[in-house]
Amino acid sequence: MSVKFMESVGYECDLQTMAMTGTTRHIYFGGKVPMIDVFIDKLDYCHEVNYDGRLELDPWSVSLADILLQKLQIWEINHKDLVDIEYLFTVADFGEDDAKKVNVGYVARRFADDWGFWYTGTTNLDRVKEHVGGVDALNDDQKAKIKQVADEVRARIDQEPKTKKWEKRSKKGAKKIWYNTGFSDW
């Protein structure tokens, strides 16, 4: 997506963000949608979510597995992001491929190679299970389904064989920072 195109349809590029992340992220303001956040090839916040070879999986969006990874990678996760995960858990199908479902195998393989991402992601699955109990808008069946899906996703993650890199990093645990702290949010 080019800056010229976005400007031609009424958006202004946030130059500060572009100066800091020029090749990976652009933020545009204006137009009918007040803000558009564009990630190029990867999202690199607390943990990297790489879209290389994955943008072709869905004609309208990043894959559902990548959407889940985008949320699970946030160490200081907030209410809105937990609700996004809970919504995904109530409406999406889960399986071992990307055909209109969350590819849990892909998520598990991604976590199996990165202890830090695994730790953040599995911690956030626990946070979802805790958070959903306080969401008054959900009925008991919906809450139970969300908890069940969180448990099933976690079980699949746990089942995936871990790499030597994961095993080596796991020995240090949370005593050493395991997530990126040098990212900038708008």
Give each language-model segment a name.
Residues V3-C46:
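Conserved catalytic core of two-metal-ion nucleotidyltransferases
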Residues P34, L43-W60, L64-W186:
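The feature captures the alpha-helical scaffold/lid subdomain characteristic of nucleotidyltransferase
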Residues S2-V3, R154:
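Short amphipathic alpha-helical segments and helix-helix/interface helices
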